[in-house]
């Protein structure tokens, strides 16, 4: 698969296109073939290691938003089927409406 990734240096100017092996889904996981992505301010901050130790380690893919379709699924993954259109979310508790304290702590993922 092709990916845009920070390899050895921080900063958006160091993001490079790389070829990576296709990911294998784990138990209860799906693999998404991303078809559209958006680079937002959070991604730029992350690419500059602007979140300090919470920025993760290199190499990483600085991406929070996108959409695609399910292209593979692991054992026990039953909520989505291959071919389903999906849009991964950054906060797993905030699915609709205005955010409130119930959504606190729901941030999921970060650097890929």
What are these regions (language model features)?
Residues 8:
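Cofactor-binding loop segments of dinucleotide-utilizing enzymes, especially the Rossmann-like FAD-
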Residues 21-37, 50-101, 109-110:
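Glycine-rich beta-strand-centered segment in the early N-terminal region that forms part
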Residues 15-17, 111:
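Short beta-strand-initiation
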Residues 1-4:
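Short structural boundary motif marking the start of a folded domain
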Residues 106:
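General nucleic-acid-binding
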Residues 11-15, 41-43:
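Short N-terminal binding/cap micro-motifs at the start of the first secondary-structure element
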Residues 18, 45-48:
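Short, acidic/hydrophobic/Gly-rich beta-strand patch recurrent on exposed beta strands
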């Amino acid at each position: 698969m092709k990916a845009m990734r920070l390899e050895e240096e921080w900063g958006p100017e160091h993001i490079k296109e790389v070829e990576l092996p296709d990911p294998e889904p784990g138990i209860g996981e799906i693999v998404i073939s991303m078809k559209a992505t958006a680079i937002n301010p959070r991604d730029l901050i992350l690419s500059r290691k602007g979140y300090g130790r919470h920025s993760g380690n290199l190499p990483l893919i600085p991406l929070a938003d996108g959409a695609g379709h399910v292209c593979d699924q692991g054992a026990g993954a039953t909520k989505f089927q291959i071919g389903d259109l999906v849009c991964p979310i950054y906060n797993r508790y905030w699915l609709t409406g205005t955010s409130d304290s119930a959504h606190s702590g729901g941030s999921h993922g970060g650097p890929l």
